[in-house]
Regions:
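Radical SAM enzyme [4Fe-4S]-AdoMet core and its adjacent flexible, acidic
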Residues: 177-190, 194, 198-293, 298-306, ...
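A broadly conserved sequence feature marking short terminus-proximal activation segments
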Residues: 30-43, 299-334
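N-terminal [4Fe-4S]-dependent radical SAM core
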Residues: 1-61, 104-105, 418
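Canonical Radical SAM [4Fe-4S] cluster-binding loop centered on the CxxxCxxC motif
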Residues: 54-90
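Short, flexible, mixed-charge glycine/proline-rich loop motifs
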Residues: 52, 65-66, 344-348
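Radical SAM/AdoMet-radical enzyme domain recognition
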Residues: 92-113, 121-237, 249-251
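Flexible mid-to-C-terminal extensions adjoining Fe-S/redox cofactors in radical SAM and related proteins
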Residues: 315-418
Length: 418
């Protein structure tokens, strides 16, 4: 029997039923009609679709360097504090391990991520990809970058058909993401985004929303629209034990949730060709929130293997649990930590998540954010919980009032109306 949750909407006598893989709207229904629909959904069969492509793919994430040319006021990794880069031989051992672990894999899904600016040591990055190309038929390059690279770097990303996530805070860039010298980085990043878009690059923009910028989401959207951005992710600034900056940078979760709803409505009502990834609305499922608990394998400049980029140094809090191995002469995995991380699931999370009506959408929120806020054992984050409980009923209600909102929120919504 399927688990089904019932979410009451702001519209009277209207509900959303969620079960893994599906959202069902019940509009203007009686209590008996609601109970009948719940029982019917509980008794439907689960459609299990096997993704055969996974059998031929493996993945690896790399933090190429801790060095960074920006000094973002909220940096989760305090990038630029050190300038050491990963050793190419460490990377080769990791790539060899991934090939040996799954010899049938023809595709390597390779992520270049921060700790610093991944593309700053461009020669090293090219050497990494060239080696991966020798072992795999196809290497999919995924990059999270601050977007300050040279034309040579941008052209390489275009030629590699990379999936590019550019961190750009738009109207807040000068205040929040200056160069290490203090110079404004806005124009160089904006121009690089325009260049990538003009060459049909696969690009999305990520905006970090602070207490300074939470009231400027519409201004951000207008600038992104003007330069042709089609996909943006709004990410709240969540300060941690290792990030740069003051706790006051974190926005009020209630204001953030309200402004998120407002900007989605603005995009829908003004026919702006922009999709918004909120991180707070997703296809209902029952798995782990992210790969931290289920397979993340990220190598660091210290030759460590971490399950989360927010813990990338051996001396950082929770590294004794979040690090899953190290690379010396070979890859050495910590099976105890791997087993521990598998338990980072909302069903094991303190705070009532296992009974919450939003659990299939929220999945308990980012486990590392929960740990930063509350330590261990895993306990729900109040920030995430407040946002979800304000945002979801509002946005689910507005979806039935304005179907354009669905197109802003999700590419292929699994929604039924009854």
């Amino acid at each position: 029997m399927k688990e089904v949750t019932v979410i009451a909407l702001e519209k009277p006598n209207s509900y959303v039923l969620t079960t893994p893989g599906e959202l069902v709207y019940l509009l203007d229904c009686t209590e008996s009609e609601l109970q009948k629909a719940v029982k019917e959904l509980e008794n439907t069969k689960n459609d299990v679709v096997k993704n055969n492509a996974i059998d031929y793919m493996t993945s690896l994430a790399i933090i190429p360097t801790y060095n960074c040319n920006l000094r973002c006021v909220y940096c989760y990794a305090n990038g630029g504090r050190e300038n050491n880069s990963i050793d190419i031989n460490t990377v080769k051992k990791a790539i060899d391990f991934k090939k040996k672990e799954k010899p049938e894999a023809k595709i390597l899904d390779l992520y270049l991520v921060g700790g610093g600016e991944p593309l700053l040591n461009f020669t090293l990055v090219k050497e990494i990809i060239e080696y991966a190309d020798l072992l795999f038929k196809e290497v999919i390059v995924n990059v999270v970058t601050n977007g300050t690279g040279s034309k040579e770097v941008m052209d390489w990303l275009i030629d590699r058909k990379a999936n590019i996530r550019v961190s750009f805070d738009s109207v807040n860039q000068e205040k929040q993401r200056p160069f290490s010298s203090g110079v404004n980085s806005h124009d160089i990043v904006k121009n690089n985004i325009k260049y990538l878009i003009s060459h049909d690059a696969n690009i999305m923009v990520q905006c970090i929303i602070t207490s300074y910028s939470v009231n400027k989401l519409k201004e951000i959207v207008k600038e992104l629209q003007n330069i042709g951005v089609k996909l943006v992710k709004f990410e709240p600034c969540l300060m941690t034990d290792v990030s740069r900056g003051e706790k006051s940078l974190q926005p009020d979760p209630r204001i953030f949730a309200e402004k998120l709803v407002e900007v989605i409505e603005y995009v829908a009502n003004n026919n702006v060709e922009l999709m918004i990834d909120t991180g707070y609305f997703s296809k209902p499922m029952d798995g782990h929130y992210c790969g931290m608990a289920d397979g993340n394998f990220t190598i660091t400049p210290e030759n460590m293997i971490t399950s989360c980029v927010e813990v990338s140094r051996k001396n950082e809090p929770y590294s004794d649990k979040v690090m899953i191995g190290e690379i010396k002469n070979s890859v050495l995995l910590n099976d105890n930590n791997i087993d521990f991380l598998k338990n980072l699931h909302y069903k094991n999370q303190r705070g009532g998540c296992c009974k919450c009506e939003y659990r299939f959408i929220c999945l308990g929120g980012c486990p590392m954010a929960n740990i930063w806020q509350n330590g261990l054992p895993l306990t729900k984050s109040q920030f995430t919980c407040i946002v979800e409980h304000i945002f979801l009923p509002k946005i689910l209600t507005k979806m039935i009032e304005n179907d354009k909102i669905i197109n802003v929120m999700c590419e292929e919504p699994l929604i039924k109306y009854e």
